Amino acid sequence: MPLSLRSFGWPLVGAAIVAVAGIFVQEPVTDALTGEAVADAGLAFSLGYLLFAPIGAVYDQLSLVTDRQHIFILVSLVVLYACARVWLGLSGRLPSAGLWRRILRESGLGAAAFAGLLAFYAYGVLGPRPMTALRADDPNLVIVDFHSHTEMSHDGRPGLSALDRRAWHDAAGFDLAYVTDHATVETDHAILEAAEAALADNPERAGERLSLLPGREVRFEGQHVLVLGTSDPTAGILESEPWPVVIQTIPNNLTRVPVGGPDGRGGVQGIELVDADPRAFRQSTEERDWILALADSLDLVMIAGSNHHGWGRAAAAWNLVRVPGWREMAPEGVGRQIEALLLRDRAEANRVVERPRLAAALPGEGPARRAWMAVTALPRFGWHILTSLTLPERLAWLGWILLWAAWPLALSPALSPRPR
């Protein structure tokens, strides 16, 4: 087939869209409280990630949408496929066949397309792939995750060991991660043993590599809360014991946040501003003002939690805690300093930074606005991906488009060797 401008039409359109989206680029990492750009930390990408940047960007952003946005995107893709098949049929571009043959053909193709979509989603949840990491420019900043799980939690991915926990957090750029498995009577002893084994595998100095620290997720006053610094679910019950750092998690009923007494016992000292559960993404958006009001009125430190149970390969947010000289300290000592800072300085002790997420409808918006946000979820999601790309990612996308454009050249008879 001779080459023509039409052969390069779609690659040119794709390259133009990717390039134009760069004019409207979003900050790759922002302060979750103020929305301002982060000057002392940024995203880092491995060569493996950049080689497959288009797939990585789609999977990353799919990991950052709410539960309802997942539904809107999936339904939009199904409707788009159905409309495309109807248009092809009406325009005479499909092979002619009898009614029952057409029904069987379209049913089979539709089932295959839907299975392919589910397989794409499933790989994003279960499959291995390079991760986007955060790197801090200030050597005194510790990048922390306060909320994560292993297979010891009833809803943790089977086989998710402490070794896997280290690998995931290390790939995401964390320095320290609290393992906060759910406390149950059946698993208490096993969790304590696993925590001891994880601590034993920590480096001597925290700056050498990622360290795991103990914690628990327990039910307290009808709420799911995190207890930091100990794997003992009874910590702080006795008056003779110090009250540990307790963090209110989301999603939860935030009208029932446990409030401590004058001595600080019996309540929480912090609350999650960002949690990577899709339901929590929705709550943190819809109830953001309430979370901020709680943090202000109760003097709570706001934190981020990956809440990672073994599904997916993207971190939504990171905590930046300033601990001078932490790299030369023992990991447990760094943990104690962080916990002391959270108790003493509260809001000043921690800074949450996050990746940009697709805008969601807010509770005060009218039905028309909410319907518009649902109907346009798919195109807005595509544009959001393109505007959230960093320069290295955008160049990688353009490289793939260049390969796409070069493909017709490779197949062109004009470039094939001619017989003599």
Q: Where would I find each of the regions flagged by the language model?
A:
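Charged catalytic cores and adjacent phosphate/nucleic-acid-binding surfaces used
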Residues: M1-F146, L163, A167, E221-S231, ...
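Active-site neighborhood of phospho(di)ester-bond hydrolases with catalytic His/Asp-centered motifs
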Residues: I143-T150, F174-V185, S211-E217, V246-P251, ...
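Active-site mouth loops of central-metabolism enzymes
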Residues: S148-L160, I247-N253, A359, P363
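N-terminal carbohydrate-binding/catalytic regions of secreted carbohydrate-active enzymes
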Residues: S153-D155, L160-L192
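Metal-dependent catalytic neighborhoods of phosphoester/phosphodiester hydrolases
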Residues: G156, T184-A200, V225, V259, ...
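Anion (oxyanion) recognition and catalysis
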Residues: D170, A206, S240-P242, L292-D296
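Short acidic, glycine/proline-enriched helix-loop-strand junctions
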Residues: E186-L212, I291, L300
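Active-site/substrate-binding loop(s) of hydrolase catalytic cores
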Residues: P214-R216, G222-G236, V245-N252
